[in-house]
Amino acid sequence: MTKRFKALLFDAGGVLVLPDPTVLGPLLSYYGGDATLDAHRRAHYAGMAAKSLAGSGELFWDEYNRSYVRSIGVSDRNVEAAALALHTTRNAWLWRWPIPESRAALAAIAGSGLPIGVVSNASGQIAEVLSRSGVCQAGEGPHVSMRVVIDSHVVGVSKPDPRIFDHAMPFFDGIERHEIAYIGDSVTMDIGAARAAGLHPILLDPHDDHPDADFERVRSLLDLN
């Protein structure tokens, strides 16, 4: 698939890193939730699907929280309490658990020489988190090298505003926007913004939560190779 594009841009949360299940597992097991890694990996995408279905913007996570805790098996009578606990615990710095398949895929893509970068709605922390979690960094370093890591807090514009991508384009000089794919996990935030910016949107949809989508989907970043 990568041969179709001259560059790739990635969202960070839900694509490269997840809310840390080693923190959320014990937290939500108190309410009867399954604490396993697999359960929490699944729960994130269930939450994102519910968030997209509701058309919720970046600041609204109620549907995500409820769907997340239901996905890990919290009973109806405990959903609101568990969702509140998730809401008060999940913050920007908790999006730090590296997705193993994504790390492997990034290494392979970078090894092919394809230009890559990150464009993420974040809180000023994402470059440090991606580096500390062993995923990537902007420029040379111990992990996968990105041409740029764009943090919405730093540049002052966030998805779904397509202007966030304007800050990445100078790092991909000579490449037309339609030749760049953007991979995200949110229909409302990522797909719409990428389309509006003239990029080719791809949704990371590991559990086929969007079977009727009118956009391209992959189950894993490994499918990009």
Task: State each model region's role.
Residues M1-F10, P98, R103-A110, L114-N225:
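Asp-based, Mg2+/Mn2+-dependent phosphohydrolase catalytic module
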Residues T2-A104, G111-S112, S123-G124, E128:
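N-terminal helical cap/lid subdomain that shapes the substrate entry/recognition surface
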